[in-house]
Each structure stands twice: as C-alpha cells, then as structure tokens.
Design a protein with these regions (language model features):
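Active-site metal-binding motif and surrounding structural segment of the metallo-beta-lactamase
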Residues: 1-27
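Active-site metal-binding loops of divalent metal-dependent hydrolases
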Residues: 9, 31, 91-93, 112-114, ...
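Short, well-ordered alpha-helical microsegments
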Residues: 12-14, 94-97, 174
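Metallo-beta-lactamase
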Residues: 29-88, 137-160, 190
Length: 198
C-alpha cells in the first residue's frame, strides 16, 4: 500500500492508518488542522491522534483546482494516478472531501460522510431519524453540509452524467458496488446512476 486518500479523519475513517507505515496519507489541510487542535467536546471524540501517530508521510492539500461536475477546487494528488481526484465537500467536517475515480465504466464518487443514507440522494430525499440526528450532531457547518448534499443529489439524478455516487455508511450502496466489481450492470441507457440503490 503506497497511498491512502481519506475523505476525513474521523475515528471510523482513520482507524488502521498505522498498519501502513510506508503509505503516503492524503487529506485536505483544513481536516488535518482541525484534527490536530481537537477543540471542543465533539472534536475530542471524533479525532483520535493515536490512530495516526505513527504516520510519517502526509500530503496536505488546500482547496484549489478545476471545476468538476459542478464542484469547485477539485484537484489531483501528488504521486497518485490522475484518474483519482479530491473533491472538497465541507460540512460534516470543514476539511471533508469526496474522492472521485475515473474508471472505464464512468466516474465513481466516494462522498464519504457528506450523506449517510442512499435515499438522501433521491429527488425527494429522506433519511432515517437516527442517521439524520447523528449527521446533525456531528456536522461542523449545516449550511455547507446541506448545500453539498443538494449538489450531490442533483448530480446523482442527472441522467446525462456518468457519475456513480456512494457514501461511506450505506450497506445497500456497498453491496451494489461489490456487484459492480463483478461485472453486474443493472442500468438501462439514460437512467440515473443512483437508481440502482433504490
């Protein structure tokens, strides 16, 4: 393992980094700074420095770069193939990012914790009460989080785009991606890339 690209440094995303001592860890600078300061009750619980104390090679990025499907400041990463891009998606944390991967079948966008449930990407979004409460409790900036959800939702429902969006915590989306990796192709021409998660 030479490179690990993180959406953010919450404990459930950064666990195990020390198991890859030779890897370069890529993250937005704002995320690294918040994780280092750990100011406030939530930050002291969400960021656990013991998970990355042994990491020797970090790459920090400021939001800058090109436009990509309606998102700004999208950039490539040092030493990583150009098919992998970092997409700033602040809100859940101020340094939260999505990771876009250009594949022969189209783009994959790991939206991390920008949303938690597949139905949040529906044209008429919904979320289970528990997940909604957790998102609100953990958010750094509600307006930014909701704005990024709106932009992700618009992209997910744009039948002309070739972007498949998924989050970090929805098991149905995970199963769909696992089927995709085995060659399963459920979509008809012109259908939403998100429809397969219904």
């Amino acid at each position: 393992m030479r490179h690990i690209v993180l959406t953010h440094l919450d404990f459930d995303h950064a666990g195990g980094l020390e198991d890859f001592p030779e890897a370069t860890i890529h993250v937005l600078r704002a995320e690294a700074e918040e994780a280092e300061v750990r100011q406030g009750f939530i930050h002291r619980r969400r960021y656990r420095p013991e998970q990355w104390d042994g990491v020797r090679d970090w790459r920090f990025y400021d939001p800058s770069g090109e436009a990509w499907f309606g998102f700004n400041s999208v950039r490539d990463l040092d030493g990583v193939p150009p098919e992998i891009l970092m997409v700033p998606l602040p809100g859940h944390t101020m340094g939260h990012a999505g990771i876009a991967i250009d594949t022969p079948e189209g783009w994959l966008l790991n939206a991390g914790d920008a949303y938690f449930h597949r139905h949040e990407m529906d044209e008429e979004p919904s979320c289970t009460p528990g997940l909604l409460a957790y998102q609100r409790m953990m958010e750094e900036n509600r307006a930014m989080r909701l704005r990024n959800q709106e932009r992700l939702r618009a992209l997910a429902n744009d039948g002309s785009s070739d972007v498949r969006i998924f989050c970090s915590h929805d098991p149905v989306e995970l199963e769909a991606l696992q089927r995709l990796s085995t060659g399963w192709r459920p979509l008809a021409a012109g259908s939403s890339r998100h429809a397969q998660y219904a």
